[in-house]
Structures are given as structure tokens and as C-alpha cells.
């Protein structure tokens, strides 16, 4: 009971976070005639690696430059994103089979496949990764044995059946599972790019690959400014109104007020 309650609370918190991040950009988009938006946030970006993101800013950034099988609508409900549709689980509620969009691409033009999800999820639960996001996968088959060292990460309940079919097996029924899949921890990762980049993956804009509405530019891993630039390879780019969003870390209220009044 405690485990289920913890998961529901965590999911509720992340929904509020993602809606506050994505929602603000979306609402401003409708109001602005210009194609460039400037926003302020209250803390630095610690990482662009979905397996390691653990704070509010990182989760917000992930939601702008990445996308999973589902995303949250304005009411906080899960809607299909990289998955073509919501699905019904098996009769016992343990197996979900998702179809991946065939027009989904990474920012480098490579297709997004079911393997990108399998690789990402197994990387996150791997004890060697030491991911603060691993607990989100608690409901997947063999999760507990993997994090305890009794089983290999390869035995996690997720399998790429083919390039566009992903099968997920749970340890117990979770009525909110498809809602959970909108959380950044469940975003895909391009295995070839991550392995080539190694430990540098997600430490700067250049060492990260994107699949969301925007790509990240101008972030070197330590600076307080960066930009979201419209991803030309995003499958739904026709519905992305902004060309660019300039972000600046503003920790002091008065500083933010001065920047606003100075139109910076």
C-alpha cells in the first residue's frame, strides 16, 4: 500500500511540474506575436541526461527537449505522443503493447525506435547508472531483483519486438501506468549516440540528442543561460509556434524585476 501511495504522489508531483513548465511556454506562445520568447527560471540546469535528472529545472528542460510514449495535456491527462494510441493491457493487466510512430525522429534525423525505449529504461534501472529516477520503474517485472543485484538489467520487463513495437510487462496491475509513461524518466535514448558520447552524455547541449519540440543550445554545463530552438525533425513541428525560447537563471526576485523592466 505504501509503495502504491508513494508512486501516486510522485506522479502527481511530476505532472504539476511538467504542466507548469510546458504550460507556461504554450500559453505565452498564444499571446506573443514574435517568434522568440524570453523566460526566467530560479535554478541552474544540472544535467540533460534523462536517467540522471532529479531536480525541477532538469525535469522542466527534459519536457521541452524530449518526449515519451505519452505527454500531458492541459488537464494533466496522458495523451499519445510517440505512441500512436492508448492501449488496453492484457486480461491480467500486466502486459502492454505499444506501437511507436513511424514519423518520429531524433534531432539528428535518425528514426526513433522501440529499442531506444528499451535501452533507455534498462540503462536507468542499471545499478551502475545510479539513477535517482530508477524508482519510477518499480512496477516493471524484475525491477526489484535488478536493483538488488539479483538479476541483470536485461531482464527488466521491457522488450522491443521490432522497430515500432514495444512490449512492457508489469509485476502487478497499475491502472495509471500509461499516465506514468509521460514522465521524463521514461523518455527514449539513442543507444549509439549515448555510448559514443560516454560519460559526457547530457553534460552540455552538444553532448545530448533530442526528440522533443525543441533542441537545447548555448548550454555548456555550467552557465546560467541557454536557448530552446525549434526542432526541425520533430514529428509535430507544425504545431510548435515558437522558433526560439531564451532562458536565463534568475535567483533573486529584484533581478528578475529589473530584467523584465529592461526588456532583457
Language-model segments: which ranges?
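Short helices/loops that flank or line small-molecule/ion binding pockets
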Residues: 109-111, 116, 254-264
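C-terminal motif of bacterial Sec signal peptides marking the signal peptidase cleavage site
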Residues: 18-21
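Surface-exposed binding/hinge segments that line
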Residues: 118, 133-192
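N-terminal lobe/hinge region of extracytoplasmic solute-binding protein
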Residues: 40-91, 209
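Short, well-ordered beta-strand elements
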Residues: 33-43, 95-98, 117-120, 166-167, ...
Amino acid at each position: 500500500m505504501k509503495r502504491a501511495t508513494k508512486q501516486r504522489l510522485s506522479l502527481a508531483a511530476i505532472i504539476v511540474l511538467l504542466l507548469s513548465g510546458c504550460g507556461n511556454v504554450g500559453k505565452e506562445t498564444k499571446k506573443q506575436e514574435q517568434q522568440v520568447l524570453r523566460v526566467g527560471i530560479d535554478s541552474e540546469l544540472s544535467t540533460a541526461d534523462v536517467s540522471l535528472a532529479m531536480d525541477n529545472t532538469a525535469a522542466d528542460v527534459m519536457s521541452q527537449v524530449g518526449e515519451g510514449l505519452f505527454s500531458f495535456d492541459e488537464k494533466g491527462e496522458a495523451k499519445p505522443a510517440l505512441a500512436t494510441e492508448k492501449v488496453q493491457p492484457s486480461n491480467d493487466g500486466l502486459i502492454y503493447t505499444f506501437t511507436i510512430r513511424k514519423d518520429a525522429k531524433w534531432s539528428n534525423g535518425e528514426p526513433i525506435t522501440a529499442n531506444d525505449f528499451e535501452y533507455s529504461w534498462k540503462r536507468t534501472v542499471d545499478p551502475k547508472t545510479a539513477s535517482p529516477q530508477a524508482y519510477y520503474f518499480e512496477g516493471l517485472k524484475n525491477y526489484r531483483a535488478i536493483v538488488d543485484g539479483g538479476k541483470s538489467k536485461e531482464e527488466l520487463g521491457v522488450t522491443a519486438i521490432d522497430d515500432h513495437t514495444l512490449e512492457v510487462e508489469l509485476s502487478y496491475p497499475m491502472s495509471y501506468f500509461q499516465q506514468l509513461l509521460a514522465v521524463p524518466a521514461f523518455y527514449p535514448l539513442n543507444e549509439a549516440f549515448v555510448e559514443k558520447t560516454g560519460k559526457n552524455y547530457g553534460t552540455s547541449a552538444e553532448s545530448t540528442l533530442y526528440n522533443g519540440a525543441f533542441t537545447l543550445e548555448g548550454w555548456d554545463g555550467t552557465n546560467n543561460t541557454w536557448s530552446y530552438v525549434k526542432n526541425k525533425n520533430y514529428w509535430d513541428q507544425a504545431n510548435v509556434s515558437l522558433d526560439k525560447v531564451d532562458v536565463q537563471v534568475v535567483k533573486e526576485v529584484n533581478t528578475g524585476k529589473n530584467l523584465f523592466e529592461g526588456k532583457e
